[in-house]
Structures are given as structure tokens and as C-alpha cells.
Amino acid sequence: MNYFVSSFLEIKNTSRGLGVFTKIDICAEVIVEHSPFSSCWSAKWEDTPENLRKVVFSHPQNSDNYVIGLGYTAIYNHNDNNNAIWLTSDDGIYIKTLKNINAGEEIFIHYGDAYWSGGWPKY
């Protein structure tokens, strides 16, 4: 596999903790990251340890299983008006832009409804 985190991405402090930002203008429909995942397990969301809920994704083959994304995947913040999406496949997690994103802007994904039913404060 050719895993990568684009060199134009950077991590910065935000009011929500860390976040992923772009140093250059990015067009829509660009894959900015392809990272592996590990630590697959099966559990109900409410039984998933709280410290893991912030960093897990649904397994691509079974949404009842969870994986931990590597690379920057656990650092992207949520926004209801997200400008990127996360996609899982057998070979890893992809982060793909949905809109044009200007240099200096934060890249946001949507965590999904299950995340918010777990009791996390919504931004």
C-alpha cells in the first residue's frame, strides 16, 4: 500500500484541541490522506471505552466493529458543515475533500450520528 499524509497538511492547536489544517489551497475531490488502521474489535458503541470513542472508525466490512486510524485520522475535528469526508476500505482510511479549502483553513470531517449519541459535547 502507498500510505501517505500530504505534506501540505499541518497540525495546529484549536479551541477544540488539535486540528488538521492545510498550508495550500486544495480543490474539492482530493484525497489528502491514506492511512492504515489497526486494533479491530467488536462492541456496542455504548460499551466502547470513552478514551477510544474519540479515535475510532467503523470497520469497512462490518459497522459493528471498530478500528483505530493511524496517521492524522484521529486529529480531524467535527463540523456539521464539513469540508472533507472519511472513507474506509480494506486497505485503510482515506480523507477526501468535499469542497475547495483555502490555505490556512482547518479541514473538518463529520463524525456521524453514532458519535453524538455517545454523550460527547457537540461543537
Which residue ranges define each predicted feature?
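Conserved catalytic SET/PR domain of SAM-dependent protein methyltransferases, capturing the structural core
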Residues: 1-123
